[in-house]
């Protein structure tokens, strides 16, 4: 494994991002080339990152020097034949322009504290790749600024113990169908931590590890790149078509765009119940499976099985992919629960590349992974929303749009949730200390 958890430069390859970003970029370039969007970076952790602004900004600005090499272009063509070759060739000319697209601020919160804020604005097709890249930059800047003393051996020992325990449990429980992919890019401790982890897992768990969501590391380590679509695809459609039709249109156009090659549907942009109303027989047959990213995984899985059965579809011909903040133990329990009833697979992130166990610094402060997100907040000047199956994950900057969206999808209007959103919007009001 690695002897150093940090590199002198965080992003060293144009491919150091999650696979689904370039999938969506391809679809956006083909279908919505003129769409304008805005994204916002939000810190969910109770940790002030404002002092990291200069270093984060410096790393983001370095992206202007990153380009797709001919070797990388040819690699994408080889592993992603579902992408339009003309689109992939056009990546030769793609350039990040963070000076134009990305803004950095320090905000004063309602309680008087400060927090780092990052906004991304521009053409959807030109700004779509920033999300996972900027998140990985923030995470690593925070790690090397505040946790540089964490010994490599701490990370290694925690990972090795997890693998030992997993092997023991697989044998004890006689589980033979456990499959998972690495999805840690956005919230990794560092690039080197993710790289080291993948090298170790590919050696120790070759029959369980299906691949990684990171294109660069998939290429370097000979792993399968894993990824389909994210919430922003569905959120953008809320502003591009009639809002009530947005989810179904997004599903239909995605299916048509890739001829079924990227057939895992994300279910919780509006919520599982609203999703099932749109996921009709044609779509249920066309998509090979669905992905869970919020709410109770067991309740969700039972609903999906019941849905397939109601349409006369054998659930064993479909795959449920679970990606909501999992560790090995949680994934094993889900795997056992649905064994022989439906195919299952897992995406695991923070637990793999950002777990330091019980490590604490000299002041006795225990290490905790950073909780951060970047989400689309508007498309073509109109607000968009993610409702989610977990209220804490809901995102929308316009309370009236959220209420209308819920009404159109026949979702219950929770007054406490609405009050919480209003409080959050007030707390995140545009009160800047620094406009960098």
From Swiss-Prot:
Keyword RNA-binding tagged: no
Residue numbers of Phosphohistidine PTMs: 231
Domain of life (superkingdom): Bacteria
EC number: 6.3.4.21
UniProt entry tagged with the keyword Metal-binding: no
Catalysed reaction equations from the record: nicotinate + 5-phospho-alpha-D-ribose 1-diphosphate + ATP + H2O = nicotinate beta-D-ribonucleotide + ADP + phosphate + diphosphate
InterPro entries: N/Namide_PRibTrfase, NAPRTase_N, Nic_PRibTrfase, Nic_PRibTrfase-Fam, Nicotinate_pribotase-like_C
Molecular-function annotations in GO: nicotinate phosphoribosyltransferase activity
Pathway: Cofactor biosynthesis; NAD(+) biosynthesis; nicotinate D-ribonucleotide from nicotinate: step 1/1
GO biological process: NAD biosynthetic process via the salvage pathway
Gene Ontology CC terms: cytosol
Keywords associated with the record: Ligase, Phosphoprotein, Pyridine nucleotide biosynthesis
Post-translational modification: Transiently phosphorylated on a His residue during the reaction cycle. Phosphorylation strongly increases the affinity for substrates and increases the rate of nicotinate D-ribonucleotide production. Dephosphorylation regenerates the low-affinity form of the enzyme, leading to product release.
Functional description taken from the UniProt entry: Catalyzes the synthesis of beta-nicotinate D-ribonucleotide from nicotinate and 5-phospho-D-ribose 1-phosphate at the expense of ATP.
Family: Belongs to the NAPRTase family.
Protein name in UniProt: Nicotinate phosphoribosyltransferase
Taxonomic placement: Bacteria, Pseudomonadati, Pseudomonadota, Gammaproteobacteria, Vibrionales
Originating gene: pncB
């Amino acid at each position: 494994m690695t002897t150093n958890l940090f590199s002198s430069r965080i992003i060293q390859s144009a491919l150091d991002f999650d696979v689904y970003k370039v999938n969506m970029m391809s679809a956006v370039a083909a279908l919505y080339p003129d769409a304008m969007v805005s994204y916002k970076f939000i810190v969910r952790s109770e940790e002030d990152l404002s002092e990291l602004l200069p270093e984060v900004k410096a790393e983001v600005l370095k992206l202007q020097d990153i380009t797709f090499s001919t070797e990388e272009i040819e690699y994408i063509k080889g592993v992603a034949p579902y992408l339009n070759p003309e689109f992939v060739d056009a990546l030769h000319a793609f350039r990040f322009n963070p000076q134009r697209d990305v803004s950095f601020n320090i905000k004063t919160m309602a309680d008087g504290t400060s927090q780092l804020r990052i906004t991304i604005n521009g053409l959807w097709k030109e700004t779509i790749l920033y999300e996972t890249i900027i998140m990985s930059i923030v995470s690593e800047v925070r790690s090397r600024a505040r946790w540089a003393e964490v010994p490599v051996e701490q990370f290694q020992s925690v990972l090795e113990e997890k693998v030992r325990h997993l092997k023991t449990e697989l044998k004890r429980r006689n589980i033979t169908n456990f499959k998972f992919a690495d999805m840690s890019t956005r919230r990794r401790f560092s690039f080197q931590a993710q790289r080291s982890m993948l090298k170790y897992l590919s050696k120790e768990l070759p029959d369980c590890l299906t691949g990684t969501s990171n294109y660069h590391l998939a290429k370097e380590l000979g792993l399968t790149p894993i990824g389909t679509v994210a919430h922003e695809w569905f959120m953008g459609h809320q502003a591009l078509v009639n809002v009530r039709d947005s989810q179904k249109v997004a599903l239909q156009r995605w299916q048509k765009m890739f001829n079924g090659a990227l057939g895992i549907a994300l279910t919780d942009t509006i919520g599982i119940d609203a999703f099932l109303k749109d996921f009709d027989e044609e779509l249920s047959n066309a998509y090979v499976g669905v992905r869970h990213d919020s709410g109770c995984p067991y309740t969700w899985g039972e609903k999906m099985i019941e849905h397939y059965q109601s349409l006369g579809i054998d659930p064993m011909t479909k795959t449920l992919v679970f990606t909501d903040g999992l560790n090995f133990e949680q994934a094993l329990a889900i795997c056992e629960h649905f064994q022989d009833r439906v195919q299952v697979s897992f995406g695991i992130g923070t637990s793999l590349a950002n777990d330091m166990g019980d490590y604490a610094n000299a002041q006795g402060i225990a290490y905790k992974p950073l909780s951060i997100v970047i989400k689309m907040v508007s498309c073509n000047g109109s607000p968009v929303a993610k409702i989610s199956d977990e209220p804490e994950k809901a995102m929308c900057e316009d309370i009236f749009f959220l209420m209308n969206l819920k009404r159109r999808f026949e979702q219950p209007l929770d007054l406490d949730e609405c009050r919480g959103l209003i409080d959050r919007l007030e707390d995140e009001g545009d009160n800047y200390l620094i406009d960098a």
